[in-house]
UniProtKB/Swiss-Prot annotation:
Stored Pfam families: ABC_tran
One cellular-component annotation, GO: plasma membrane
Annotated compartments: Cell inner membrane
Biological role stated in the UniProt entry: Part of the ABC transporter complex LolCDE involved in the translocation of mature outer membrane-directed lipoproteins, from the inner membrane to the periplasmic chaperone, LolA. Responsible for the formation of the LolA-lipoprotein complex in an ATP-dependent manner.
EC id: 7.6.2.-
Species of the source: Caulobacter vibrioides (strain ATCC 19089 / CIP 103742 / CB 15)
Binding site for ATP: 42-49
The UniProt record lists the keyword Cell inner membrane: yes
Protein's gene: lolD2
Domain ABC transporter: 9-228
Protein name: Lipoprotein-releasing system ATP-binding protein LolD 2
Topology in the lipid bilayer: Peripheral membrane protein
Keywords linked to the UniProt accession: ATP-binding, Cell inner membrane, Cell membrane, Membrane, Nucleotide-binding, Translocase, Transport
Lineage top rank: taxon: Bacteria
Length: 228
């Protein structure tokens, strides 16, 4: 078996509240491998977003190890963490956050041009991703001209533009109807498998969880393997 893209060991996260310390992650361990899509479930407030933010180097855990491609990132400087995050991790959120004045092609190409790619190279990669997600006919459409499901697929393409090794998605289909949610998830799953991207997807949708390679549940700050 290949080495994990993401490895969490003994992850702990505690928030300060007026009532005292609120632990949301208590010694979480998790490995995610190339091309594996892992579902993360749990009630609101259980710590799903905290786990994703820690895994994606957006937050520092209070204790524990976060390793990306075998490198412990827990004690690196913010500059080093940012560099690794930009090169290794893609994010998808419940809201697509597309720039309304740009086309689908331009939205997806933008992270590549920011990273120093030529316009030609950026647009070629953007076109490849959009076509793989069934949006080859929507390249020049702005977000307002697309359905919610199409907008979210553009957001997925944008997250994958820089060829990340890890994709973290926080309720990526939460604003979509059931049929559209399934279609978007299937497109996401397929492109992650094809490109060997490890993915962790937080969701409340148990129907979608059934399609994932593995599902883990956050309960009382601990991860448990979930049968679906």
């Amino acid at each position: 078996m290949s080495d994990p893209v993401l490895a969490l060991r003994g992850l702990e996260r505690v928030y300060k509240t007026e009532a005292g310390d609120l632990p949301v992650l208590r010694g979480v361990d998790l490995d995610v491998y190339p091309g594996e899509v892992v579902g993360l479930i749990g009630p609101s407030g259980s710590g799903k977003s905290s786990l994703l933010h820690s895994a994606g180097l957006l937050e520092r855990p209070d204790a524990g190890l976060v390793a990306l491609e075998g490198r412990d990132c827990s004690k690196l400087s913010e500059r080093a963490r940012t560099r690794i995050r930009l090169g290794t991790v893609g994010f998808v959120y419940q809201f697509h956050h597309l720039l309304p004045e740009f086309s689908a092609l331009e939205n997806v190409a933008m992270p590549l041009t920011i990273a120093g790619k030529s316009r030609r190279e950026a647009e070629a990669r953007a076109r490849e991703l959009l076509e793989s997600l069934g949006l080859g006919h929507r390249l020049n459409h702005q977000p307002a001209q697309m359905s919610g499901g199409e907008q979210q697929r553009v957001a997925i393409a944008r997250a994958l533009a820089n060829r990340p090794k890890l994709l973290l998605a926080d309720e990526p289909t939460g604003n979509l109807d059931p049929a559209t949610s399934t279609a978007v998830f299937q497109a996401l799953y397929q492109v992650c498998r094809e490109q060997g991207v490890a993915a962790v997807i937080a969701t409340h949708n148990m129907e979608l969880a059934r399609y994932m390679d593995r599902v883990v549940a956050l309960k009382d700050g601990h991860l448990e393997l979930q049968r679906v």
